[in-house]
From Swiss-Prot:
Any Gene Ontology CC annotation: extracellular region
Subcellular location: Secreted
UniProt modified residues of type Phenylalanine amide: F10
Name of the protein in question: FMRFamide-8
Keywords (A to Z) from UniProt: Amidation, Neuropeptide, Secreted
Protein's UniProt keywords contain Secreted: yes
Family according to the record: Belongs to the FARP (FMRFamide related peptide) family.
Cystine pairings recorded for this chain: none
């Protein structure tokens, strides 16, 4: 999940 990982990075 690209979107989910990007959110977790923030």
């Amino acid at each position: 999940a690209g979107g989910a990982d990007n959110f977790m990075r923030f």
